Amino acid sequence: YQKQQFFDDPILSSELLEEDPIGRYPQITFSAMPQLFSPAPVYFSLDSQYANFMRDEGTEGSRVDINPLLNWPMKLSHHFIFETQAGLRETAYLDTHNKEEGEDFDDNRILPTFRASLSTKFIKIFPSKSNSQRRYRHTIEPEVSYFYLSHEDQDDLPDYDGTDRIEQQNRFTIGLTNRLMTKLFLPDGSSSEREMFFVRAGQFYDANTSSQPFSNSFLELRSRPTDYLYLKSDLEYDAYDSEIEVFNGLINIFDRRGDYLNFEYRYAGASDDEANSKFPDITSNGFADTFFEEDP
């Protein structure tokens, strides 16, 4: 729940590009999926990025951002999963040059993080009434979590993008996930799976804020009711002002041959609405890769 924007390619406004045009040449990203780290169920993962920033005015230079994480999940009384995660995010700024002041410098930032969550899962598996070779699995997954990110003075660091200004976080989150999966057993013994419906809702409480500590309520929805239709949207609702602050909608339509059509709509508060249609490559959207194993 730390990331509330669910679209991979945010649209940059022309005003932003005109105010602070900046290039990244090159930008290299490396991520390591969670790997078992010890005999105990401790997993190691890594997100890292190198980028070299160039622009006509202001500060330019290179940045290395490394975020290693240790994750320790454990079962409690066969019904609950308690998970802890610790990280030490380090960001190094190299060969930094301020064109306005004519200064060269290097700097770095270290941000310890900690996360703990408690969750459970209610599961029901049932057959299809119209097809004996198909199974459905419905899960309801409530979760409460706590996330802490330490404070660090970042005023003297370069400001290239959102990575350079990360606010202190001390948050309690409550969320609920509702998921419907389907699995079809094929005559050759293989099977195919599809996530038909996914909806997640939640809200967090910021312990560092005395006024209006509750965040926007956020809702994420995605659905693939057929093999040729995919729907996705996310929404943020401001309970203090009683208004929708952010809404994004996406519709993908495609056929057996690989032709596809993409419709998008984006709304962000007082900014202008945006609607567009395009024909991008449609890639996997991270459907769940674990499922039940009953034979038909």
Name each region found by the language model.
Residues 1-296:
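Outer-membrane beta-barrel proteins and related beta-barrel translocases across Gram-negative bacteria
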